[in-house]
């Protein structure tokens, strides 16, 4: 390990470019309809949860969004600043000023002014408030819908996985090795869950959850009965959607029975072997000897 002496040497810390993405997660029509402001939302445009992450290569593995149960969240009519398309977004009220300038806000009963790509100020108005706990259970569309969430069914599986497999035998399949059993669980994923660890110190107050990356994500997903998004290789082993370099696996590396059951081959083929593309921001990280 590194000693405190080594970590305090001159030049040990440096500003470098790190990766960051604010993702748009589109609510399903049924979920929009559950909101009191549904009519206002539908009359303006599509509605999205927005979630910020510094690990964009984990986004293909997203299966849930986590909100703070007691935080104040707002529905906002605005524009996509890159395309100028009218959209609705949902985020923590406390974080609005980090994404939208106060100069662009108009009253709820005032029509939004027009916006064009390149304009400096993005118009917006807040049309409703919700506590995080009111958003629990709302569903959104899979961000990259090429692979369905799958879990392994064995003696180590969580009870919610075993119970789901027993209740849905039509979704259970055996890997090509004729040994390992799996269950497709798309219906249980892509919904909002609650977490006390969510903060409004940065980001949007909505946390993107990828159970295959990190113990915290895995635990909160398991507690909420959220399946993970795996790939299954030819040995019947589970692998994350991308490797540690952020590259999509090739189809020829995957179990054929898994591909037949859970993969949209046409869509996946467009991306196999590619790297997840990232935006960049300056972030202070430690530069240790040898890096």
Where are the language model's segments positioned?
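Active-site cores that bind ATP or allylic diphosphates and position pyrophosphate for catalysis
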Residues: 1-50, 57-59
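Non-cofactor substrate-recognition interfaces
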Residues: 37-49, 56-291
